[in-house]
Amino acid sequence: MKIRTLYMAMLFISPAGLALSAGENNKNIDLTHVISDYRISLTSLPLDYSLLEKKQRPGVMLQRFNLNSQTWSPQGVVSPERWQNGVDIYIPDSAREKNALVVINNGSNNNGSGTPVAPTNFNEEELSRIAIATRTVVISVSNVPNQVLSYQGVTTPLGEDNSVAYSWKLFIGDTHKYQDASLHIPMAASVSQAFRLAKKELTQQNINKFIVTGASKRGWAAWLTALSDPDVGAVVPFAMDLLNTQKSLEHMYQSYGKNWPVAFYPYYNQGIDQQVGTDKFARLMRLEDPLTYLNTDMGDRLK
């Protein structure tokens, strides 16, 4: 009798009621595992990289590699899907063992016309000086993110914050479909893949822990790499403090007289400002905001 009653009840549940139930479940979905799961999935694949150059600089040996770090195109809407990162390793004379500094660097695979652009956040001279002064192996991971990227339905290829903002728009538009759409996910994965390369190439230095740094969105990627990869021993992000991101953005808006700073324009342009305070934005922040990881099994990495 109970089974029959349940069956009859199901016949009269409206599609709207079913959609509401799915929506309620979606509100509570745990997204803090997404970046870590993505990183782990890449470790099951052979590492694809090649040595481009070795050259001796005063006080430091520089080794340049090309790393095909991953294939990333959520639902096939992003191209090119293969990510290529430059990995430059600076080994100073009498290098210290165990720890290496990893610099998440900018640069472009192409500038829209097929021409690569060298990284400018940290150049070769600066990285060499850091390695020599600290006797620390320094690893630069460039083209993070890969750019420019073409998104289906968008006429102009996107780079930097324009690309991040559009990836957020995809996620917010359909969290279930585009759960892995945030550009910070492959950005963090690029760094973890560079760790794998470094461990293979730096056996003499016995490197097994990494101090990760980067500027702006690469600083954000440094946070997320530290949370998702146990090989990170410390993180030094060069970025504004946006921990507790939703509250920070609300405070920013009020501080600018109920307006946004110029640097926020790519996100304003994609309508992200209209989503702050919504359940959809809160779901995005479960993946993006480092403080949301405090009460997870990764929370100890923030302490």
Predicted regions mapped to residue ranges:
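Gram-negative bacterial Sec-dependent N-terminal signal peptides
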Residues: 2-20
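Cap/lid segment of the alpha/beta-hydrolase catalytic domain
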Residues: 110-119, 135-189, 243-258, 264
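Hydrolase active-site cap/lid region
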Residues: 224-274
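Gly/Ser-rich "nucleophile elbow"/oxyanion-hole loop immediately N-terminal to the catalytic nucleophile
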Residues: 174-189, 193-216, 232
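Catalytic-loop region of hydrolases
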Residues: 23-97
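Short beta-strand element of the alpha/beta-hydrolase
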Residues: 86, 97-108
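Serine-hydrolase catalytic core
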Residues: 279-303
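Glycine-rich nucleophile elbow surrounding the catalytic serine of serine-hydrolase chemistry
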Residues: 214-224
